[in-house]
Amino acid sequence: MSEMTPREIVHELDAHIIGQNKAKRAVAVALRNRWRRMQLAPDLRQEVTPKNILMIGPTGVGKTEIARRLAKLANAPFIKVEATKFTEVGYVGKEVEQIIRDLTDSAVKMTREQQMKKCRFRAEELAEERILDALLPKAKEDWDSEKKDDSGTRQIFRKKLREGQLDDKEIDIDIAAPQIGVEIMAPPGMEEMTNQLQGLFQNLGQSTSKRKKLKIKDAFKQLIEDEAAKLVNQEDLKEQAIDLVEQNGIVFLDEIDKICKRGETSGPDVSREGVQRDLLPLVEGCTVSTKHGMVKTDHILFIASGAFQMSKPSDLIPELQGRLPIRVELDPLTANDFKRILTEPNASLTEQYIALMATEGVTISFLESGIDKLAEAAWQVNERTENIGARRLHTVMEKLMEDISFDASDKSGSAFVIDADYVTEHLDTLVQDEDLSRFIL
């Protein structure tokens, strides 16, 4: 779990996302509260439930980007799902309980990687012995002289192996065969049986190995993975992963506004109000059956987000509204925000294009006047047509760099300066003509 303070979390998010301080502060406090809760006495810890968050804001202002960056900072089981991919129980499609199953799978993977890192040193020793066994047939136990010779030879080969002198030599080695995932389609209500069958098929394939001819440097990497996997206790791993999900799990529900029931619609809403009702027990706290064991959702943090352009938060069913107590509104982006997005974040759009063209030997430089004009153009197109937020910058930048990108391979050694005149020449007609803007930008 991340031990970063809210200020440190916001600072990290600032490196990638411009503005939206209210949303950043809300998720930073929520993430820090996960750590604070774990410092409490066990009795009190059980009573402290997470305060779920609803982020409201137009498309392209940074809601999903906050989730992506938060996943890297959290150091905890994290899953981002689209609410529109789920249907209510009884209909064809994914049920909402699959969210918790996927979250548990990611926790098992995370825990396995952590445990394999801990036993990597021992795994390297065992992998080295297996390679030496493949290089040197074992001496017969009856002949002491041969044993001694073999031991000396083994040390010589061990030294060569560690120095990398044998990296390109090929050996035949038994490698654990990759497990084949088995997807079983089952009717609603039969998830437990499905999980048991999947576990059975996975157990059947665990002991299979495949003989391969590999270079020693490639074989060594695979053998380390094999040996580390053998050293990991699977039962302990599952227990730790489930505990990690229950205490620190985070679910990001994107596009939640798309499952709102709008007042003017009539008839069954298979993927709308029914999905909200199915989400209720997950958000409130229930027990979900997974192939790794039973998972309680009482202390999983849910962060929902939506644009709410065709609906409003009050269109969510009241019970679900009550379980998303923290509301954060994200601000629409201005021309000044666009300018900052082009220059300030790590690996900004301008940096990316400069680096891409440098691979062809072409030098690109963006002047401040050019960046100002570019930001203004993107903002104007958003105002005149559909407002898609920062995503408009990708469209405008691609159109601006179209000629340079196409000719770059033939113009190695040349330099281009992107100033206000260059931007005006390449974009002004498109920006001013509303019909062209709708189709091209």
From Swiss-Prot:
Chief localization: cytoplasm
CC per GO annotation: HslUV protease complex
Entry keywords, A to Z: ATP-binding, Chaperone, Cytoplasm, Nucleotide-binding, Stress response
Keyword Metal-binding: no
Subcellular locations according to the entry: Cytoplasm
Residues that hold ATP according to the record: I18, G60, V61, G62, K63, T64, E65, D254, E319, R391
Known partners and oligomeric status: A double ring-shaped homohexamer of HslV is capped on each side by a ring-shaped HslU homohexamer. The assembly of the HslU/HslV complex is dependent on binding of ATP.
HAMAP family in alphabetical order: HslU
Function according to Swiss-Prot or TrEMBL: ATPase subunit of a proteasome-like degradation complex; this subunit has chaperone activity. The binding of ATP and its subsequent hydrolysis by HslU are essential for unfolding of protein substrates subsequently hydrolyzed by HslV. HslU recognizes the N-terminal part of its protein substrates and unfolds these before they are guided to HslV for hydrolysis.
Family: Belongs to the ClpX chaperone family. HslU subfamily.
Protein name, per record: ATP-dependent protease ATPase subunit HslU
Protein's organism: Shewanella denitrificans (strain OS217 / ATCC BAA-1090 / DSM 15013)
Lineage: Bacteria, Pseudomonadati, Pseudomonadota, Gammaproteobacteria, Alteromonadales
Gene name as annotated: hslU
